[in-house]
A protein has these predicted regions:
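Conserved alpha/beta-hydrolase
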Residues: 84-99
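Conserved acidic catalytic loop of the alpha/beta-hydrolase fold
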Residues: 113-130
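Conserved alpha/beta-hydrolase "acid-adjacent" motif
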Residues: 292-298
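Glycine-rich "HGGG/HGxG" loop immediately N-terminal to the catalytic nucleophile
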Residues: 72-78, 95-109, 167
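Conserved hydrolase catalytic core segment
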Residues: 129-167
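A catalytic-pocket lid/entrance helix-loop region that shapes and gates access to the active site
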Residues: 153-202
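Short beta-strand element of the alpha/beta-hydrolase
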Residues: 60-69
């Protein structure tokens, strides 16, 4: 799931006072646009090399920004969520997406690989501990990384909670959000023959992994358009246009579907069942009440498992 919008009036890692009028533009409440001070590639396996960037203050507090999708890629706008004078803002493209290579590759691409890659980046930069910031799928990966390396997390700031449980996948990709966005859901559903519509994720996976490039691209466009149409409170034509960028859509859709059909390579409910070792980590959960992609119930259930967390809806 993609990082789509400002969903509350506070971010733990921002020292900027935050008040937001209903008609405020996002650039009015974020820090100014900045460019990276350093970029590079890190070889994480014989097959995969991941892109990374650092922006802000090289001597500032390190924060790792974990993007959505999976397959969404890092974004320049993510740099604007942090005070560039106080934070060393680190982003990377997860395996197979963005500037990482090979593009749209599914082999050696799973949650455990991603956790390992985050730790490889930390070691590569010589960072002892860092803040962790992630939204949507980025919240999923942030939590699993923290559960595997609780001693490396200074804090967790999570937006749009998505834990990739079967119930969440069913809500968005099969039945649930479809009742709120029937007009956007219909093209996504009707791309699949009626006799396969009982399991849309499986049907899309078959097409997204087809040997026929045109079949892959057509499926990627419809998968991506469905998500882009529902990821923002107010429809954004530029956001919808991402589905027309088939280079982006193919990696985004293939990698997402690959993870989802495999239950993100962990048991269902893994995150909620493994919160005991991260209860000490300062955690802020920011959730949009009307988020169609990442329903509020997930943030609520996570907050109950992390009683010391701060939940902002």
């Amino acid at each position: 799931m993609m990082f789509g919008r400002i969903e509350a009036k506070y971010y733990q890692l921002s020292s900027k006072p935050f008040t937001m009028a209903a008609d405020a533009e996002i650039d009015d409440v974020l820090y100014s646009k900045i460019e990276p001070y350093s970029t590079g590639m890190l070889e994480v396996s014989d097959l995969h090399t991941i892109f990374w960037e650092r922006a802000g203050n090289p001597d500032g507090q390190p924060v790792i920004v974990i993007h959505g999708g999976p397959g969404g890629g890092s974004q320049p706008g993510y740099r604007q969520y942090f005070d560039p004078e106080k934070f060393d803002i680190i982003q990377f493209d997860q395996r197979g997406c963005g500037k990482s290579t090979p593009y749209a590759e599914l082999e050696e691409n799973n949650t455990h690989n991603s956790v390992s890659d985050i730790e490889s980046l930390r070691e590569h930069f010589g960072i002892d501990k860092w803040h962790i910031f992630g939204g949507s799928w980025g919240s999923t990966l942030s939590l699993i990384y923290a559960q595997n390396h609780p001693d490396k997390a200074l804090s967790l700031t999570l937006r749009g909670i998505f834990m990739c449980r079967k119930s969440e996948l069913q809500w968005f990709y099969q039945h649930g959000a479809s009742h709120v966005f029937p007009d956007a859901f219909e093209p996504y559903q009707n791309h699949i023959p009626e006799d396969e519509q009982h399991d849309l994720i499986s049907a899309y996976y078959e097409r997204l992994t087809s040997d026929n490039v045109e079949i892959r691209r057509a499926a990627a466009k419809e998968w991506t358009r469905w998500e882009m149409a529902t990821s923002r409170l107010f429809p954004d034509p530029e956001y919808l246009d991402k589905a027309e960028d088939l280079d982006f859509a193919v990696a985004f859709a293939r990698i997402e579907c690959h993870y989802f059909i495999n239950g993100i390579f962990v048991e269902d409910g893994h995150i909620l069942n493994n919160c005991n070792n991260i209860t000490h980590i300062p955690t802020t959960i920011v959730q949009g009440r009307y988020d169609m992609v990442c329903p509020t119930v997930s943030a609520w259930e996570l907050h109950k498992q992390l009683p010391n967390s701060r939940l902002i809806i």
